[in-house]
Amino acid sequence: MLAVFGHLNPDTDAISAAMVYARLLTRQGTEAQAYRLGEPNFETAYVLRELGLEAPPLLTELPAGSKVALVDHNESAQSLPALGELDVTRVVDHHKLGDLTTINPPYLRFEPVGCTGTILLKLHREAGLSVEPQDAKLMLSAILSDTLHFRSPTTTQDDRDAVAFLAPVAGVNDVEAYALAMFAAKSDLGNTPAETLLRMDYKVFPFGDPVQPQNWGIGVIETTNPAYVFGRQQELLAAMDQVKAEDTLSGMLLSVVDILNETNRTLVLGATEAKVLREAFGAEAEGQVADLGNRISRKKQIVPTLEKYFAPEA
């Protein structure tokens, strides 16, 4: 049985892609099972409730040599521990190629689109297989989530075309209303502990020297209610300090993205982070908050800028 899973701290695309791809592979004759590497966030939980589905089983480890398929990620820091000991047979992703190494030649499908769901729709078409309504809604939800309903600069025409095709198959007549309902669920943070908020959409990235990299943790909270998040600023800064120590990081950032206004204000933990934001982005931290303007995409606008900043001198 092939294990299919997305990244740690899974978002809607990571969980939806695992579920859809596992079913697609099974329909094509490869027995596959979807898994998750963490708890679904509030938005993903809403999508699953809408569909009457349970989240995939939680996966914490696999025996060395187990065959796996990765979706929505390919970097070891964002995946199952000891990924290098597993037989990665397939990767379907829309991120840059990271440090992935494999035991055997894998099937790779990378495309510069806004969401793995967009690629999975293409795989259905290429296989000559119909898209089931349940899978259509999972892919639709993932694309709306990853692209912030086309607000993100990662959005491509392929993503727009995919949504136009998937919405009627999924039975979603008003895409805007459905997207807003998803974002409202994502923003309903209630009394969630600060560290949980921080880790909901949190990834570790190695920058600089590949032999001795600087590992930075970059969290994102996408919300329609940023005032609530900043009302808990001191709690979040304390959680950032704790996570920075726990994960042995060189730096820690938390971007609070206002979905509707398409702005990013980032919490700045200390002097190290303030210096990097000033020199890399030209953003000054005031009251431990830096205004990063319309840089709302970690993948396309934050991480590449930091990679360039930390790049070793030739």
From Swiss-Prot:
Its cofactor is Mn(2+). It comes from the Bacteria. Its main location: cytoplasm. InterPro entries: DDH_dom, DHH_sf, DHHA2, DHHA2_dom_sf, Mn-dep_inorganic_PyrPase. It catalyses: diphosphate + H2O = 2 phosphate + H(+). On the 2D-gel the determined pI of this protein is: 4.65, its MW is: 32 kDa. This is Probable manganese-dependent inorganic pyrophosphatase. It comes from Deinococcus radiodurans (strain ATCC 13939 / DSM 20539 / JCM 16871 / CCUG 27074 / LMG 4051 / NBRC 15346 / NCIMB 9279 / VKM B-1422 / R1).
